[in-house]
Amino acid sequence: MDILCEENTSLSSTTNSLMQLNDDTRLYSNDFNSGEANTSDAFNWTVDSENRTNLSCEGCLSPSCLSLLHLQEKNWSALLTAVVIILTIAGNILVIMAVSLEKKLQNATNYFLMSLAIADMLLGFLVMPVSMLTILYGYRWPLPSKLCAVWIYLDVLFSTASIMHLCAISLDRYVAIQNPIHHSRFNSRTKAFLKIIAVWTISVGISMPIPVFGLQDDSKVFKEGSCLLADDNFVLIGSFVSFFIPLTIMVITYFLTIKSLQKEATLCVSDLGTRAKLASFSFLPQSSLSSEKLFQRSIHREPGSYTGRRTMQSISNEQKACKVLGIVFFLFVVMWCPFFITNIMAVICKESCNEDVIGALLNVFVWIGYLSSAVNPLVYTLFNKTYRSAFSRYIQCQYKENKKPLQLILVNTIPALAYKSSQLQMGQKKNSKQDAKTTDNDCSMVALGKQHSEEASKDNSDGVNEKVSCV
């Protein structure tokens, strides 16, 4: 842009396109005395810089000039950024719906993923469109200056919330592997929501200094007309607190979780191979279902038993979940690391580095980081069957899973042992009463028959007696 404004040869090369676009040449009609501008006037306007000393690069930064000189480039950029925005919003809305409606997905880890989807969705709604607008305006801030600090605050807030959620998920999974009894006993829906609130509170606290100081001093959020963090202290401290420290915790806990799962799987396989019998903890009450679930992961019983098979299955499920989360962690790190590393380099080698190159890299890397918010729903779709089936139904506007007729047949063919003993006793009493009533009716009918036969025989005997007496 600066080259086009400063070099006369570059400006004269654009006259061919100006001669072909009569409608666009009217943009310069205000600079001439005549009502309509012709091609020679346009040529003189671009070349005769001596007679027009007030012409500068600032005049070339108007929206009409930008749309004329960079029409093709800006349209491609707008198209790519619009695709990222649509994928981010639509995909994360599907994740929120899936966790809210599917009972299979309602657990602590998926609640964290739903909150992460909310952060990514808000990033697509509030931050990405404004960033796309700045691209169209040549990375100049086109909105009121007070909104610049608010926009940077939202950008840092949602990006920090994303990595804080991933860090919290990694810690939660590690605690669940290391201490399953304590984790299962104290891990409820309420506790999960409290952890999510804590994550959002930390994210707000980290990003709050930006609007506090940025609204008071515009120089902290403006640099040469562009809306960005211009304070080196903000850049350094914010990068380490909001990204590098949580990243270190997330990576360490994730690898410790993988190591613990491998160790547990090795122990379980060795127990199955050697058929070693360990303590059975038979003193536990059979009616305590929660206690049984708590010890399924930490107790290995006789090989071939139901508990041993289920322990191995639980380890396999944990490994699959860690695989999916590992892919999410890896993509987030790969997509955001270039931006934060370049951001730190811009502060450290401020004098020796080329600011134009650093600025261009930051503009590209920030959108690669935004792309991670759109990738997460795709990962869930590829590696989780429940998410995949839920997304396909939601796209078809089917928000409830269709029940198969076989399920109704199974409900109607429940064996008698599935009922409670009290229900069986009541049924037996009812049947015994009906049998007794039937027996009484039968007995009464027999009695009536006997009575009728006795009366008939009595009548006959009376008749005989009467006849005898008469004789």
Curated annotation (Swiss-Prot):
Note on domains (UniProt): The PDZ domain-binding motif is involved in the interaction with PATJ, CASK, APBA1, DLG1 and DLG4.
Q: Which residues lie on this side of the membrane: Cytoplasmic?
A: 98-111, 172-191, 259-322, 383-471
What does the UniProt entry say about where the protein is found?
Cell membrane; Cell projection, Dendrite; Cell projection, Axon; Cytoplasmic vesicle
Outcome when changing G463V = Loss of interaction with PATJ
Q: Can the keyword Manganese be found in this entry's annotation?
A: no
Check the UniProt entry and state the signal peptide residues, or none: none
Its function, per the record, reads:
G-protein coupled receptor for 5-hydroxytryptamine (serotonin). Also functions as a receptor for various drugs and psychoactive substances, including mescaline, psilocybin, 1-(2,5-dimethoxy-4-iodophenyl)-2-aminopropane (DOI) and lysergic acid diethylamide (LSD). Ligand binding causes a conformation change that triggers signaling via guanine nucleotide-binding proteins (G proteins) and modulates the activity of downstream effectors. (Microbial infection) Acts as a receptor for human JC polyomavirus/JCPyV.
Gene3D superfamilies xrefs:
Rhodopsin 7-helix transmembrane proteins
Quaternary structure per UniProt?
A: Interacts (via C-terminus) with MPDZ and PATJ. May interact (via C-terminus) with MPP3, PRDX6, DLG4, DLG1, CASK, APBA1 and MAGI2. Interacts with GRM2 and DRD2; this may affect signaling.
Query: Topology in the membrane?
Result: Multi-pass membrane protein
Concerning InterPro entries, the annotation shows: 5HT2A_rcpt, 5HT_rcpt, GPCR_Rhodpsn, GPCR_Rhodpsn_7TM
Motif position, PDZ-binding: 469-471
| Organism of provenance | Homo sapiens (Human)
Task: Tell me the protein family, please.
Answer: Belongs to the G-protein coupled receptor 1 family.
Protein's UniProt name: 5-hydroxytryptamine receptor 2A
Sugar-bearing residue positions: N8, N38, N44, N51, N54
Highest classification ranks of the organism:
Eukaryota, Metazoa, Chordata, Craniata, Vertebrata
Task: Indicate, by first and last residue, each region the UniProt record lists as having compositional bias (Basic and acidic residues).
Answer: 451-465
Q: Please give the annotated consequence of changing S239A.
A: Decreased ability to bind serotonin and psilocybin
